[in-house]
Amino acid sequence: MGQTVTTPLSLTLGHWKDVERIAHNQSVDVKKRRWVTFCSAEWPTFNVGWPRDGTFNRDLITQVKIKVFSPGPHGHPDQVPYIVTWEALAFDPPPWVKPFVHPKPPPPLPPSAPSLPLEPPRSTPPRSSLYPALTPSLGAKPKPQVLSDSGGPLIDLLTEDPPPYRDPRPPPSDRDGNGGEATPAGEAPDPSPMASRLRGRREPPVADSTTSQAFPLRAGGNGQLQYWPFSSSDLYNWKNNNPSFSEDPGKLTALIESVLITHQPTWDDCQQLLGTLLTGEEKQRVLLEARKAVRGDDGRPTQLPNEVDAAFPLERPDWDYTTQAGRNHLVHYRQLLLAGLQNAGRSPTNLAKVKGITQGPNESPSAFLERLKEAYRRYTPYDPEDPGQETNVSMSFIWQSAPDIGRKLERLEDLKNKTLGDLVREAEKIFNKRETPEEREERIRRETEEKEERRRTEDEQKEKERDRRRHREMSKLLATVVSGQKQDRQGGERRRSQLDRDQCAYCKEKGHWAKDCPKKPRGPRGPRPQTSLLTLDDQGGQGQEPPPEPRITLKVGGQPVTFLVDTGAQHSVLTQNPGPLSDKSAWVQGATGGKRYRWTTDRKVHLATGKVTHSFLHVPDCPYPLLGRDLLTKLKAQIHFEGSGAQVMGPMGQPLQVLTLNIEDEHRLHETSKEPDVSLGSTWLSDFPQAWAETGGMGLAVRQAPLIIPLKATSTPVSIKQYPMSQEARLGIKPHIQRLLDQGILVPCQSPWNTPLLPVKKPGTNDYRPVQDLREVNKRVEDIHPTVPNPYNLLSGLPPSHQWYTVLDLKDAFFCLRLHPTSQPLFAFEWRDPEMGISGQLTWTRLPQGFKNSPTLFDEALHRDLADFRIQHPDLILLQYVDDLLLAATSELDCQQGTRALLQTLGNLGYRASAKKAQICQKQVKYLGYLLKEGQRWLTEARKETVMGQPTPKTPRQLREFLGTAGFCRLWIPGFAEMAAPLYPLTKTGTLFNWGPDQQKAYQEIKQALLTAPALGLPDLTKPFELFVDEKQGYAKGVLTQKLGPWRRPVAYLSKKLDPVAAGWPPCLRMVAAIAVLTKDAGKLTMGQPLVILAPHAVEALVKQPPDRWLSNARMTHYQALLLDTDRVQFGPVVALNPATLLPLPEEGLQHNCLDILAEAHGTRPDLTDQPLPDADHTWYTDGSSLLQEGQRKAGAAVTTETEVIWAKALPAGTSAQRAELIALTQALKMAEGKKLNVYTDSRYAFATAHIHGEIYRRRGLLTSEGKEIKNKDEILALLKALFLPKRLSIIHCPGHQKGHSAEARGNRMADQAARKAAITETPDTSTLLIENSSPYTSEHFHYTVTDIKDLTKLGAIYDKTKKYWVYQGKPVMPDQFTFELLDFLHQLTHLSFSKMKALLERSHSPYYMLNRDRTLKNITETCKACAQVNASKSAVKQGTRVRGHRPGTHWEIDFTEIKPGLYGYKYLLVFIDTFSGWIEAFPTKKETAKVVTKKLLEEIFPRFGMPQVLGTDNGPAFVSKVSQTVADLLGIDWKLHCAYRPQSSGQVERMNRTIKETLTKLTLATGSRDWVLLLPLALYRARNTPGPHGLTPYEILYGAPPPLVNFPDPDMTRVTNSPSLQAHLQALYLVQHEVWRPLAAAYQEQLDRPVVPHPYRVGDTVWVRRHQTKNLEPRWKGPYTVLLTTPTALKVDGIAAWIHAAHVKAADPGGGPSSRLTWRVQRSQNPLKIRLTREAP
C-alpha cells in the first residue's frame, strides 16, 4: 500500500516525448490535452469497451480505429493521428510499453478431469474490466515468490483476472528436461503478492485454467465456486480511516475504486460497501449519477428504463457469476458505479474558496502549497497535479502568499518560465531569511529613535537660527529707538524758547523762578521709576509702565499663564516657548512693522465654560501674553469698566470659574442658543431613562439575532491601505474610536479584508467623525431587495384627522443590531494608537454605517419589533422611515399616552432615541424635511434656503445637484418638468455646457416658484381624489386635489415629459398619454383610492375607441387597462383649466370633437387614396431590389409600366431593400409632377410610410420610441415632400411576385425584373442620387458684401441677374462668409493642414467657386486652437554658444547617467567634466541623491582641483535639492541650472556620457566581463586621452605632455627627486601650460564674442509651451502663455516657474509667428488720468 497505480494513460503522459517522436514517425502531430480528452472521455463512448485510463489491448485499439475511420458523418477525422499513434505504441512497443503488452497465449491443453464446464478458448475477453486487461496465458504452477521492493506497481492492471492473478509468462520447462510435459490442468497458479497480503488467511483456489474467476467467487477444492464476503474489520477500517464522501469525495472514490479492482465484489458486496461508506443521501446521489451514465446501443446516454435497469439494477439481479455473461454484467455494473461516484463527487466550482486560502504568518511555503492544492481538488474540477494547470496554481501561489513573499516572487526575472517547484524553492529562501519579531521591533525602535533624534536636531537648529535672527532684529530695533530718542531730545532743546531773566521755567510766568513757583507740587520726592529696556540708560526718558488691568490667569497645557485682555487682538498670543510649534504661520502687523510668526500646536485651555483646545500665536517679541477675541468669544466674556478698573465676567455676569470638559464635547461650546424646548421636560427623561440615548447608553436590540452578511459566490477579500490622515483629523476621531472600543462596538482583529477610514469634519465645528469607505465591500456582498419606504408616498398613510404628532429620531440606530462573528472581519480597518497599545486592525461588532444593506436590515428589524405595538394601539398612526419615527394621534391625551407606550416599548426592546431631537406631543413638527401642521405639509425654510443658496451652476455636476435638490420639492411646483426642460439637456454626458438666457430664466423661475410654494394637504384615504390634467407641447401637468368643504385643496402638483412617440401625436392623443402618465404617478399618493379625472378633452371616448393609425396594440392595451378601470378611475366633465393653478375656470371652454380632429389629422395629403383613379394620366409600378452577389450587397430601383421601363438605376452598394423601395416611389412621384398618377408598390413599408407613418414621423420629429433618429430619414423626408407634386395621386399596394396574367401582376413582375437587372448589370452612380440633401449653400441663399463684389470684379466674374449670383469659371461663386463657414466646418471635422485641405478641395470638383479660398483656409488652419495644441512644430531657433571656464577646475558640468545591469548595487555613474580642458571624473554610485553629489564634490573634486567657481547641471532632483543648493551657497559656487528637457544645454557632459557608455559596451564585449565598475578606469583613460576640437587631449591640456605609456620609472626615486632634470621638467611644464591655456582661453572667448542670433520672441508675445510628458489623448502643447522675460536662448512665461528654452515654444498669435504682430498707438485724452490705445495692422 502507498505505491502509485500506473495506467496506460499515465504511462504515455510520463513518456510524452517518446509519444511525440512516434507520432512524428507516423507523419502526424498530437497534443497532450486532446490525447487525454480522447482517451478518457471520447473513446469510452464508442461502446467497444475502451476504459477511461486507456489500454494496450490490440483488439480494442483496432475496434476504436474502425470507429474513427468510419466514412460519412459517423467518422472522426480529427482523432485519426491519436489512434494511429496509440496503435503504433501497441503493435511496435517501445521498451517502457513492452512489459504491459502481452503476447497471445498458446492454445490451451484439454484438462484431464474438469470439475466445471469448459468454455471455448478465446484470445481476448469480449468486454473490458475497469482497467485494460489482456487474456492470461496458461502455465505451470510456479514457486511462491517473495514480494520484491522494485518500486513497480503492486497491482497488475493489464489482466482481467481478480486476485490472485495468474502468471502471464509462458510455463517454464521441467527441471528434468521434460520440456514438452505441461502442468496438469487441475493445478492453479499461486496467488499474486497483493492477494496474499489481502486474503492471506484464505485458501488459494484451485480453478480450471480455462475458466475466468471473479472474486469473491473462488473455486474450492471440490470444483465448486465459493463466496467470500467482506470482513467486518475491513469495512470498519475503511470507514474510520477515511474522510466522509461529502468532506473529500475524491479520496473516498479512490478507495472504492481500489476495492473494486482488488476485491472484485458482487452486486451485494457493492451495496454493502456503499451502505457502509456513504450516507443515505450520498448513496442515492451516487446511484442516480450512475444510472445517468448508462449508454444505449448508439453509445450515447440512454433514458430507457429497461436498458437502465438491465445495466444498473437497483434490485438484486439474477446474474450467474459462473457464466461469462454474468461476470460481464458485474464488470459493467462496477464501471457504472465508479462513474457515478466520480460524477456525484464533483463539487460545483467555487474559485472564491480557492482564493480565500492565504499563507499564514508563520506557515511555510510548502505547507501553504499543500493547502492550496487541496482547495483546488475540493472546490474545482481541476487537478492541481495536471501539467496543464501548473500555470494557474503558480499564479495562485504567488498572489495568495504572504505579502512580503508575494512581492518578491512577482519581481523574479523570467517568471513565466519558472516551474512551481522553482517558485516554492524561492519562497522557502525568502521565508527562511525573514527577520524575527524581535529583530523587527529592534529595527522599528532604532528607526524611531533616529527619526526623533533628527527631528530634535532640526528643531534645535531652527530654534537657534530663530533666536539669532530675533536678537539681530532686536538689536536693530534698539539702535533705532535710542537714536530716535536722542534726536528728539536734542531737537527739543534746540526748539525750546529762551527764558527771560525773571521768568519761571515751570509755569512760564514772570516774577519768580521755578524753585519758588507756587504752582509746582510740594511734598517728598517719590522713587524714581525704573528705566525701560528700550531707553537703556537714558536719564531723560520715561520708563515703561507695567501692563494695566484687566488681567486674567488661565491654565494652558496645565501651566497657569496670566493674560492681558486685549479686545483689539484678533488672536491670542503666548510669549514663552510653549513646546512644539506647528508648520502654520501668520503675518503680524504692529506699530514697528510686520513679521511672520508661527502657531503653536493645539493646547488645552481651561475656560469658565469648559476645557477646550486652542492654537496660540507664538510671538516672543510681545511684551505680555494677550487674550484675544478668539478665546474671549469661546469664554463668552463680558468686560465692565468701573471706577476701580475693568472687570472680566462670565456670560452670566459672574466671576470666571474653571470647568473641565471632555474634548469630544467641545463643539457644544460653540452651539448657538436655542429656543427653550417646552415639549421635552425632565419628566420624560426621568420616566423613561432606558428609552433615551442620553440616559440609557448605547442600545442593543435584544430580540434580534446576530446578522450574517452573505457574500457573492465569486467574491474575494479586498484589502485597501489606509489613506494618509492629518494629525488634526487623527486627534479628532481618536476620542470617538476610544469610546466605541470602550463600548465594545469596535474590537481588535486580524482579517484579510481592509477598507480605509475617512475623517469627516462636522460643519461649523472642529470636531471630526470617523466614516469608513465600504464601497469595495458593498460590491462583494449579495444584494437584497430594498424594503425601505419611499418618502414620496410615506405620508399618504397619515390621515388629516390626526393632528397631534410625536417625532423620535433613534440615535446610533445601526449599532443596535449585532453582527455575527463570521461576518465581522468584512468591515476591518487600520488603526494605530501608541498610547493605548493598538497597532493593527479594528472591526465592528455591530451593523456599521456605510454598508449598503444597513438601512434595509435595520428597517426590517425595527418593523418586526414594533409589530406588537401597532396591534395594541390601532387608533394611533406610526410611520417609520429607517430610524425616524412619527406617531400621530387625534388628541393631545392620546398622543401623550401613545408616546409613553412607544418610549416604554423602545426601551424594553433595546433602542435609544435622541432627546435633543425629540418633538413630543406637538401640533407642528418637522419630519423627513417636511413641516407637518394642521393636516398639511409644507416645505421647511431650511429646504428652501438650501435651494436658494446654491449659486448659478457652472458645470453639469453642479446642475445635477441643483435639479436633484429642487426635484425633491417638485410636488409644490406646478409644471416643474416644463419649467426645468431647458436645464436637463445640459446634464447629459458629452454635451457642451452652454448656459444661456433660456437656462438662466428656467433657473430663476424654479427658485421663484419655491418662494411661493403653497401648503399641500395630506392625502385622506377616506375621500375620493380629483386629478386635473393639462398638456402643452409634450409636457403633462396636473394637480391632485381633495375636497375640503366647498373648496378643492391641492395634495400634489404633478408634471412629467411625454416620451418621444407620444409627443408626436395630435393634441387629443397627447392628452390621453398625459392622463395615463399622471394617473400612474398619482397612484403612489392615492394608494388605489377612487380617482376622478378632469381634462379639457373628452378622452374617455378616445380610450374606448382609439384610432388604429397612431397607437400600437401594446400601448393601446396599457392605456385601456389603466384608464378603463371603472372601480378606481372615473372621467368627469370636460373643463377648461387655469394655466397658473391647473384648476377649472368659471367659464366653459371651446367644445370640440376629438374623434373628428383625429380623423382629419391622419395623413399628410388629404386627397391621397389607395383606390385607382379612373382618369389617371399614368399608371406606373415601382419596385426596389437588394441582393447579395459575390459577397457584396447590390441594389437597384425601377419605375415601369406593364410593358416598358420608365426609369431604372443601380443604387450604391449596401443599400437596403426598404430604402430602395422609398427611392423608387419618390422617383415616380417626381416624374409625375402636375399629373394624375396611379402608382403600385408591393412594399408594405413604402405604402405605410406614404399613407400613415410619414405624418406620425413628422410630428414626433423623426425619432423612434427610444428617442433615436429613425432609419432612412432623408428618404422619408423626400417622399413626404414629393407627395404634393402630382395633381392627383393614388398609391396602391399590390402583392409581390404574382404569377397571374392581370395587369397588376404583369406590371409588378416588370418592375421587379427591371430593378434586379439594374442592380446586377449597371454601375451605381453616386453622383446622381435621387434624394437631394437640403443644403444651406444654394444660390438663393448667397448674399454678397461690398468687399466680395470688389474681389469678384477684380477676378473678372460675371453677375447672373436671372439667377442672382456671380459666376466665375462657369461655377456659382460662394461668398466669403459662406466659404469661411464651410471650410471651418470641414476643418473641425478633419483638422487637416493647409496643404492637405487644399489638395482635398481641388480633387473634390465642387460645383461652387469659393471666394478667397486659400486665404480663408490658411487663416482657419493657423488659428485652430486644437491644431496648435497637438501639431508638432519645427524649431527655428539657432544654436547658442556654451560658456567655458578660463582655466582648469573652475567650471564643471555634472550629470547622472544610469548603466544597466547594476552589479553589486552600482546603477548610476556621476560624471564631472571640466569645460576648459575636457578632463573627466566619473564615480560609480548606488543612488542618485544630493548627498552623493555633495560628498563627491567635497571629497574628490575640491582636494584635487580646487574649489569650483561655476557648476552646470540639468534640473534633476539631486541637483535642485535644497541640500545641494545650500552647499553651493556656503562655498560660494555659482550653480547654474540648464533648461529642462534640453540636453544641448549640458551638451559637453551629455556627450561624455555617451562616450563612456559606448566604451564600456565595447570593453565588456572584448573582455567578456559584466562588471562595468571594474572596466571604468579603462574607459576614463580613453576619454582623457582623446584629442578635442583643438587637437589636444585633456591630459595634455592639464599636464602639458602626453601620458607615459611604456617608460617605467626607476624604483629608487631618491636619486631623481632633487635632480636638475626634474626641476627643468617642472619649469617646462609651467611654461607649456601657460602656452596652452592662454590660446585656449582666447579661443573660447572668441566664441563668446561671436554674435548669437536671438530667438524672435519678445516680452508680451503669446506662445504655446511644449508638454514633454504627454498622457493618453493629451495635447502636445499647453497654454497659451504670455512672455515675461527673455534671454538669447530662453524665455520666462507667466504661470511657469522655470525658464523654458526657445526651442520648446511656438507662437500662439493668429499670424503664426512673432513677426506678424499688431501695432498699438497711444493717444492722449481729455482726462489727464486716461490714455487711449488704438490697434493698427502692421
Curated annotation (Swiss-Prot):
ZnF bounds (CCHC-type): 502-519
Enzyme Commission identifier(s): 3.4.23.-, 2.7.7.49, 2.7.7.7, 3.1.26.4
pH dependence text: Optimum pH is 5.0 for protease activity.
Motif segment (PPXY motif): 162-165
Pro residues: compositionally biased ranges: 108-124
Binding positions for Mg(2+) 2 per the UniProt entry: D1183, D1312
Assigned GO CC terms: host cell late endosome membrane; host cell plasma membrane; host multivesicular body; membrane; protein-DNA complex; viral nucleocapsid
Reactions this protein catalyses: DNA(n) + a 2'-deoxyribonucleoside 5'-triphosphate = DNA(n+1) + diphosphate; Endonucleolytic cleavage to 5'-phosphomonoester
Residues of the Integrase catalytic domain: 1444-1602
Biased composition, class Basic and acidic residues, residue ranges: 163-178, 434-466, 486-500
Modification sites for Phosphoserine: S192
Impact reported for S192A: Complete loss of stable anchoring of viral PIC to mitotic chromosomes
Residues holding RNA: Y723, D773, R775, P789, N853, P855, K1056, K1057, K1084, S1186, L1188, R1244, K1268
Region (Interaction with host PIAS4): 345-393
Protein name: Gag-Pol polyprotein
Organism: Moloney murine leukemia virus (isolate Shinnick)
Gene: gag-pol
